[in-house]
Amino acid sequence: MVDLFEKNEINGMTLSNRFIRSATWEGMATAEGACTPPLIDLMGDLAAGGVGLIITGHTYIREDGQHSPRQLGIHQDTLIPGLQNLTRCVHEHASKIVLQLGFGGAYLSKSRLRRMSSQDFQDLTEAYGQAALRARKAGFDGVQIFAAHGFFLSQMLCPRYNDRSDDYGGKITNRARALLEVLDGIRNAVGRNYPVLVKINCRDFVENGLTLEDSILAASMLEKAGIDAIELSGGLLNNPNIMRSKMDPEDTKGYFLSEARTFREKIQVPLILVGGIRSYEVARELVEDEVVDYIAMSRPFIREPGLIKRWRAGDRREAACISCDNCFEPIKKGEGVSCLPLEPEATETFFPQLSETVPASPPYPPGTGYKISIGLEDWQSNYIPVIKIQMALNGQILERSPSFPLGTQDHQKVTQAITDLLEKRTNIN
């Protein structure tokens, strides 16, 4: 029987167990992207709670790559001292921490969209390398390249976004070029002995998105280029099932289990699976069956930072997280991520512009539908475009974020409705 608490290594980085805190948006940095005491406290609680590896929320590697307010930055040297306080705190609790490197792409909060030139790609590759070097100087045990969920490097992999006809577009060997160049740029900056991980979508789950087959091909290229571990996720930020709420019992075995099994047949480097895992027994089974090497979780650690310590002590009850997604509500007020009870009566901060309701399929009763709204969300007086999906029965809202299996008829109908509303919104603007 596999021991999930046995020490292991990723390119010389020794971990105390096989549990990883997946990158989570904390919303606790300063307006300039600097580390803060509350963020250090949060990471310290995670480390003290027994998780083997912490991956930070995605940081921005250049000032023009910031995605959201109070996002942690790694774009300049002046940020290093504050980050050193963070890594020191984590290491005092015998845990390890990896910094996730990101760039907003089409989700940028400060830049206008434009087609990138060859020089732009070179400059961005250099910025990733310099950011990784800052991370190493700050004491991080490694870095993770963020190439999932529709952000820049994910968009490059996705035919839906990437319609280029040059060396960076077309077949997957070209669409993966930017990601491979980023990996090479990081290696040139920090060397081969510094752990470099990547987070990618196993598939995008949208029409004309990244397929499982192409994702595996991209992963194979990363493996040959010397990536140290691959974390598997799925979906785009504007996809209704990127992060499900009110999970069904089957979801607790992992959203992307079947895709992970297919990956394992082709990929030899360590695989990390995130999404929907709440049970110690499921985690043990996945590692024991050699489907993946590591288990990553996000929301369960917001609810219960000491979850791994509890499991290690012998209390193997499932994670207490109910996946209500209310943990991200405080970020809108500038308070940072935290677990809160679900409060349907909370003050509304969403201002819809367009909406449409599509009927739900059986076994839902007649009159049940998915209300899709596109509008603006008030995040500390920063109005950000948001897609909101609610389940309704005869016009009455039942769930703020319904759950349905990826690839089903309902999933396809909702995805198409989102696409149609986005086109209408573009025409209005």
Regions from the language model: what does each represent?
Residues 13, 93, 361, 375-377, ...:
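Compositionally biased, intrinsically disordered low-complexity segments
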Residues 368-403:
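A short, structured beta-strand/loop element
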Residues 392-429:
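Mixed-charge, Lys/Arg-enriched low-complexity segments
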Residues 1-349:
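Flavin-dependent oxidoreductase catalytic cores
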Residues 13, 104, 344, 377-379, ...:
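Generic structural motif
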Residues 348-368:
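Negatively charged, low-complexity tracts enriched in Asp/Glu with abundant Ser/Thr
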